[in-house]
Regions:
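Membrane-interface helix caps of multi-pass small-molecule transporters
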Residues: 26, 51, 76, 80-85, ...
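Membrane-interfacial amphipathic/re-entrant helices at transmembrane-helix boundaries
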Residues: 1-20, 48, 55-62, 128-134, ...
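Helix-loop-helix "hairpin" substructures at the membrane interface of multi-pass membrane proteins
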Residues: 142-219, 223
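Alpha-helical transmembrane segments within multi-pass membrane transporters and channels
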Residues: 58-98, 256, 260
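Transmembrane helix-bundle core of multi-pass membrane transporters
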Residues: 89, 93-96, 100-165, 195, ...
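Loop-to-transmembrane alpha-helix initiation sites
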Residues: 13, 90-91, 118, 145-149, ...
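Transmembrane alpha-helical segments in multi-pass inner-membrane proteins
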Residues: 204-279
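Cytosolic-side transmembrane-helix boundaries in multi-pass membrane proteins
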Residues: 177-184, 188-191, 263-313
């Protein structure tokens, strides 16, 4: 029973983080931009969602959309620092991530009667609604939650696929892989980079908002390690489905997020006190990187042998 509950919890967490992984897929894989500001936009989405639900009493779906807008704005700032002010990608992301630490902490003042800052805020006892208020309990609640989260991930995955299939999506991909193509068409590649970073951080904020509603609490430190989590998800998904051309990259990334979250949840069974959880997380990520490198070499050798065999024939 413990293993089943751990698996179901891992699936729920995986779907929460799948949207985050989709955003990082845009910034890292498509734009080739090391966007560390994800560690800041994830909690930004959570605190904006919490403030909207607590202070404005707006519907949970609208709170998620407003969180997307806040994350997209932060991503736009990262893009402007890089494109317009010529700051390196890594430093641009670090600047925004650092600034967001203060922004998110300042927004928590709206959650307290005295206006003081807080790092943790619980939804319970405040009559706040969430996407998962279904009046269910036990396995029925877990199943319904997984269904809602799966539908959300599927929606965002399809939206990305549709967008990347448009002319603007083609320009976005070209801006990351070969900006000269964009320039040759009379367009500014920098503007498409800004757009891509806005989308990526918007998705990160959505993930933070959904995660906050799922856990029924906001934690100002929730963004810690989310870049590692998302990158691991992208690497796992892209590696596992590299040879299956019928599987879209967005699908692979989402599945990678679920697999990685399941692995993290199973690690909790090993370290019940949670003391070494971050260490185990780091070791797992290192193993994924090494495994991905070895898998790439193996596939390269197999491809070379096939080519050699075809040439002899």
């Amino acid at each position: 029973m413990l293993f089943l509950n751990t698996t179901l919890d891992g699936l729920q967490m995986g779907f929460c983080f799948a949207v985050l992984a989709l955003g990082v897929y845009i910034s890292y894989s498509i734009l080739d931009f090391p966007d560390l500001s994800v560690d800041g936009t994830f909690p930004l989405g959570g605190v904006v969602c919490t403030v909207v639900l607590f202070r404005l009493n707006l519907p949970p779906v609208l709170a998620v959309l407003l969180s997307f807008a806040a994350g997209a704005l932060a991503g736009t700032v990262t893009g402007l620092l890089h494109v317009k002010l010529k700051i390196t990608p890594l430093l641009s992301a670090i600047i925004v991530m650092t600034a967001l630490l203060s922004v998110t902490l300042a927004l928590t003042q709206l959650l307290t009667p005295g206006g003081y800052t807080t790092t943790i805020f619980s939804y319970r006892g405040h009559g706040m609604r969430s996407l998962f208020d279904l009046g269910l309990s036990g396995m029925a609640e877990k199943g319904a939650t997984i269904g809602i989260l799966f539908g959300m991930v599927l929606l965002f995955k399809l939206l990305i696929d549709l967008f990347l299939g448009t002319r603007m999506g083609y320009m976005l991909r070209a801006a990351g892989s070969n900006s000269r193509v964009v320039v040759s068409l009379g367009r500014d590649a920098g503007n498409y980079k800004i757009l891509g970073l806005a989308l990526a951080n918007g998705f990160s904020a959505v993930s933070g908002a959904v995660y906050t509603q799922y856990t029924m609490s906001y934690d100002n430190t929730s963004g810690s390690g989310k870049v590692v989590l998302a990158l691991a998800s992208v690497i796992i998904g892209m590696s596992l489905f590299a040879r299956l051309r019928f599987v879209r990259n967005t699908t692979a990334v989402a599945v990678g997020a679920v697999i990685y979250s399941l692995c993290l949840n199973y690690l909790v069974l090993v370290d019940t006190n949670g003391i070494y959880l971050k260490l185990l997380n780091a070791v797992l990520f290192a193993l994924i990187l090494v495994g991905n490198r070895q898998l790439s070499r193996l596939l390269g050798r197999l491809k070379a042998k096939r080519a050699e065999g075809g040439a002899r024939a």
